[in-house]
Design a protein with these regions (language model features):
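Intrinsically disordered, low-complexity regulatory regions of eukaryotic regulatory proteins
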Residues: 3-4, 25, 49, 81
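Generic hydrophobic-segment detector
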Residues: 12-13, 21, 27-28, 62, ...
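DNA-binding patch around the recognition helix
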Residues: 16-18, 41, 84-86, 90-121
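Compositionally biased, intrinsically disordered low-complexity segments
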Residues: 6-7, 69, 87, 106
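Positively charged, aromatic-enriched patches within helix-turn-helix-type DNA-binding elements
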Residues: 32-44, 48-85, 91-96, 101
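A structural micro-motif at secondary-structure boundaries
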Residues: 20-47, 112-121
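N-terminal hydrophobic or amphipathic segments with adjacent small-residue motifs
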Residues: 17, 25, 31, 66, ...
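Basic, amphipathic DNA-recognition helix from helix-turn-helix-like DNA-binding domains
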Residues: 1-22
Length: 121
């Protein structure tokens, strides 16, 4: 679970087995992700990003905010690394035509996870 404090997110240990939002579910023990009860195959780092976004749905985060929350503030990593992992997440979510989840880009700022309405499909 993540809590927003003064514009920053803070990781708090999630004791629940599953975190769910709309069609998306992550298993906090096995570190697996599911959309419409179908497992999506993603890397461990993409899983951490998905976990962060899932705990903050419909919230846009800057690339720097995602880096700080997922990698830690002491890591010097380029913004392109985030873009690569977001591309991986997009492809994984698009693989299943039944999955209504979408990674949205906030141009020149960052990303969020959203639920696509039936009209958007």
């Amino acid at each position: 679970m993540f809590i927003i404090e003064e514009g920053h997110s803070v990781l708090i240990e999630n004791t629940e087995r599953y975190t769910e939002w709309k069609d998306l579910k992550i298993d906090n023990r096995s570190k697996r992700a599911y959309c419409c009860n179908r497992e999506i195959n993603i890397s461990p780092k993409a899983y951490k990003i998905l976990e962060f976004l899932l705990n903050n749905p419909d919230t846009v985060f800057s690339r720097e905010g995602i880096i700080n929350s997922v990698w830690g503030k002491r890591i010097n990593i380029g913004h392109r690394a985030i873009d690569v992992h977001m591309s991986e997440l997009r492809k994984a979510l698009k693989t299943d035509n039944y999955c209504n989840m979408k990674i949205r880009t906030a141009r020149s700022f960052g990303y969020s996870i959203e639920y696509k309405n039936c009209e958007d499909l």
